[in-house]
């Protein structure tokens, strides 16, 4: 009680004491004692900077959404003058803000700068020293975040472009006996043309022995509002319900890539706790399916692009302190499964397009639909037909919880093959998946042809041959009776993985069948070694009852040599292969990478034990460069030698010229960093900007934000980019421009003096004419450090709001630099009156 009274008295005494605070301001005369004039420091006294264009990181509700240059202007809010960002409605949409809910955002009839405070309970903070712009909005003002799918308004159809992926190969073999040689030449060309939303694609191959062959040619475009895709030309029918067939016609179908994955397919939820701000990597079968940055604390990744199937996800949490957390997440999905309420469809019609030109022209059509029901059920079905073929299918998929996942469907087909009677039959199909916590994964698929009268569409149409081609138009009347396949995988903690797989197919009326099975084991050791064991057997019985079988075993061992050769990417391996005929082959090799992973090399020697023993040697090289990829191989043994060379890459023609690079996928970013040559893009071996500062960056994911990155370490000494990461959101098949703001020029320590012989005030903003962002700030000795200066330039200096509080000067870089590689110069700044 005594202490309570003492604390109470002390508290009352302190509460009666006044508290003084003081606002500190800049004295302009102290800042510029040599200039003799009053400097406008009112903005600095308010904790502000001069208005202008600044590079900032943008955060919405604490989450970083963008980085870039933003124009800041002086505006009054609540009676205070503030530096206020000028943001467009398109930028807010990109940041994930639902602008349609707030029509008052657009002020004065223009979309140049929206009224950010039109969103109730919102707040804007600009932290100049941190280069951070923070926007706080209520949760209901945000657009839903669906699996990385960006708002439709931000989808970029790209620029007009003509491009081509190419792959060429030449092999020549010389035989020691007789001196004969055998040459083989191959080329594959995949040209494409983009005009607006339309995509024109083709694929053509050429063999020396067979000549030219076209695989496909078609035009397609996205129908964004209905999340579908229209295709005209040579394509394939949907394969989820009926067997896919090649057609030439029209197809319209749901485009799953436009829709958040979790809305249409089942996927597991990955949960964990990050100790620091971390990068969470999720792998499926060794391939990365998700790579997300998360803040410290609990996290949840619910929308993973797995594409069906079952198995185990490996989750690696890369903490910012360099440590890792690793755990696994098992999952099951049925063969056909949609989320509740999601509808998917596919319609097509046209001519059947077989691989040979001996089959008669037949018109076909197909319709397929799938719908997600409550209680983890999916109903699906479809129709397929031609002049002599009609089929209908109906199926259902279900999640069974602890019992796994299953889907089953039945197809009724009525058909008539050429010069045969009409037939009718059914096919049942069942798929089952189950994963156990013990690390066991079971996948069983069974197709049972319940009646002999069932035929597939392609099997029926292939019997109708063109006139006078009967002898060349061969087809097999054999009908599959049933087919069963299974895959079983068992993880052994600390000891690797064991895999089993089997397959059997039987036919009606005769004894023909195909049976195969395989057993495999693999283990990766902590020291980098790896061991793989495989045993497989295949047995075929033809219609005459003749049996052939093949037994094959393989041992593969790899171990790193870095322990003895230093920190080099060099490995050695041993492989033994044995077959049922008694042939045993041993192979040893050394392989690795060099020149910043651009060159892959592989040297091998092989020895055969059986009969006439022989050895063979082989050398393989592969180089990935700025303008493409080149490979070569050479091998020889006692009977022959072989030499080969291959070249592949990509070429894009746009309004910016011709850009050659490594082979890309269908969706491409044209990287533009003017005049910056040799900069690495995306950390992919050999992918660098060409002599103009351009390159092709492929394999982008459509309708999602893709980050294209230039490695700043690889920039030339005289180059600078304001931001080394550019975000693009392409539509499927687009060629989008990834533009980097680049400056090429010298680094300069510049001492400024005004034309009235007074020093330039401390804190003055210096910009280079023709550039929107500030380049430097004048120090206390009228000095400023500038980068990216051309040989000749004009600088603009401003230290106040009035015109007479600015000056300009023409700068010509000296001939020589100092020891640090920077120029040093003094110049007079001409006052603007």
From Swiss-Prot:
Signal peptide interval: 1-25
Disulfide cross-links: 807-829
Subcellular location: Cell outer membrane
Sorted UniProt keywords: Cell outer membrane, Disulfide bond, Membrane, Plasmid, Signal, Transmembrane, Transmembrane beta strand, Transport
Protein's gene: caf1A
UniProt-listed GO biological process terms: pilus assembly
Pfam families the UniProt entry points to: PapC_C, PapC_N, Usher
Family according to the record: Belongs to the fimbrial export usher family.
PROSITE patterns given in the database record: FIMBRIAL_USHER
Chief location of this protein within or outside the cell: membrane
InterPro entries on file: Fimb_usher, Fimbrial_membr_usher_CS, FimD_plug_dom, PapC-like_C, PapC-like_C_sf, PapC_N, PapC_N_sf
Its biological purpose: A probable role in capsular biogenesis. It is likely that the caf1A molecule binds F1 antigen subunits during the extracellular secretion process.
UniProt-recorded name of the protein: F1 capsule-anchoring protein
Any GO CC annotation of this UniProt entry: cell outer membrane
Record membrane topology: Multi-pass membrane protein
GO molecular function: fimbrial usher porin activity
